[in-house]
Amino acid sequence: HTSLSTVDILDDKVVDRFIAETHEKYNEYFGGKIGEYIKGFFTDEPQYFGTATPYPHLIEKYFRKNYGVNILDQLGLLYCEKQGYREFRYKYYYVCQQLFLHNYSEKLYNWCSEHGVKLTGHYIEEMGITQQMYYCAGIMPFYEYEHIPGIDWLCRRFLTVIPAKQLVSAGAQLGKDEMLTETFALTGWDVTPTELKAIAEFQFLYGINIMCMHLLPYSELGHRKNDYPVHFSSSNAWADDVLPKFNGYFDRLGALMRGSEEDVKAAVL
């Protein structure tokens, strides 16, 4: 495993240490009663590697225990289309997903559940099935381990409906009624409230019902103003005037949707 930006979060011992240095420290600060003071944690873009081949520390042990083989004997099948390569690649990415799912996502979810806080956030590259393989090998199983499952929606584009429909489908199957989007990043400083309203309504049309709006920074000094704007700070000329009505509209729309049940007429298998 080699990465410049992340540790091996598929390793349960690494995740245990992460929780000890973050969640447990916050809980200690609040006298062991963190759930009385904060609502939850937001996990942002966890992934097993990125646009390269993941090789978590535990994968060799998993292959020996569950498949009875030495993964090193077949590793070349990731790059060569020889006999058995399809089966091996399926197993390889399935194992990566299972290690990620249970050693990171489930651990965080269980800790939050035990301490009275909610886990929300989003993973990465939910926009298509192929992109998901690079980062998590399929996004839908991960939504089980978020109290408020979420997606990321970048730019001004009206993108594919795949991320919203996968999220809402998983939520319906799991009995979750809150579906979150982190949205409006990369829309730019010149984006208008009308454009943002259209972007949000498109997502709400497909079942999203809570927005985590990007971004309200502590400061706009230096390069901070270039952090994937738009920002809803005092540097935004219309934010103070428009946001109360804007947020009120989507608060009411979201509440209506969370109190409703979608009448689904078709299943896509």
What name fits each language-model region?
Residues 1-32:
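Catalytic and substrate-binding clefts that recognize carbohydrates or anionic sugar/phosphate headgroups
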Residues 28-40, 45-269:
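Carbohydrate-binding surfaces of carbohydrate-active enzymes
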